[in-house]
Amino acid sequence: MDILLLERLVPEALAWLEERHSVDCRPEWAADPAAVRKAIYNAEAVVLPRKIQVTREFLDFAPRLKALARMHVGTDNTDLEACRERNVRVIQATTANVRSNAEYLLGALLLLMRRGIGSSLIGDRHADIRLGRELNGSVVGLFGLAPTAHTLALMLQPLGVRLVGYDPAVHHTAPIWRRLQVQPLSLPEMLAQADSVSVQMMYASRYQGFINEKVLAHCKPGKLWVGTSRSHLFDGDALAAALKDGRIEACMLDGAEAGFASKGSPLHELENLFLTPRIGSHTRESRLRASWYVAHRLHETLAPRSGAMDQITSVPMGLDPGAEPRRAAFIIR
């Protein structure tokens, strides 16, 4: 067996791989650690779901492994040093969900700008709803310049939004700010000026609890927050206090970690906190992009070519699941 799939690719990408390699698609084994350990022993490459941790012990059960791939972004579940030591290539579809996450953030901003959306969604037509606002003429703060922020900036500018931003890893003189037409500010300045904040900062363990009481003290009252970053960026107590005292009028976050707002948490049952189960990146289009990226990189790793070109057929996914796909050929070098 060349490739073990513990997470499915789209059918077209799977068929393309099967024409070139021995592929075993067994997503049902992902919940059985014993089955996974047994299956990876003979695999040269594996596609893993988010929930499977790659540790040194995991790699001990995969002596032939040359590549491991994931359809999602993030390396906190992978021991990268151990992979480097064993010459295992780590493949991630890092840009596949950029546009889908940017669209989620834009949609979340538009929803929260219409105050009372929570009452309206549950059918309360007589709720005491404050007047909403429009994005046009407002100031949006981009917290983090991850690739999603680049696409979001291009979406917001035609709507008449003034963009300000902050990223602890990007100097205020970096050309990217000018290129995106985003005014770089210090964190206190951004929070003081922005009417709403979009959080898409790349997460690292050193940023755990980065958005704390000291940071949120700079929020002007009534700010709206949306985000697709890891919820570990937030200090739960500080966020709860800001949601309760009005510094943050409403907050919508995608993909919060387990326990973030569960019973016993200060965020539990706050009516102005909206959590969605990682739906920002969960689109047909992003799944298609991720599947083809992973398929191409796996083939590249297992069948390296010296100057040859491989004809690859990609099948764009339309919005109608029953429609006959169009076939578009392109070259991978």
Residue ranges and their predicted role:
Residues 1-91, 192, 212-214, 218:
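An N-terminal-biased, well-structured beta-alpha scaffold segment characteristic
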Residues 104, 222, 228-333:
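Rossmann-like dinucleotide-binding domain for NAD(H)/NADP(H)
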Residues 44-45, 67, 196, 224, ...:
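Short, Asp-centered acidic motifs that coordinate Mg2+ and/or phosphate
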Residues 167:
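Conserved acidic E/D residue at the C-terminus of a beta-strand in Rossmann-like folds
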Residues 148:
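Hydrophobic/small residue at the entry helix of a nucleotide-binding pocket
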Residues 86-143, 151-159, 309-310:
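Phosphate-binding beta-alpha-beta segment of Rossmann-like dinucleotide-binding domains, i.e.
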Residues 54-56, 170-266, 282:
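Rossmann-like adenosine-cofactor binding region
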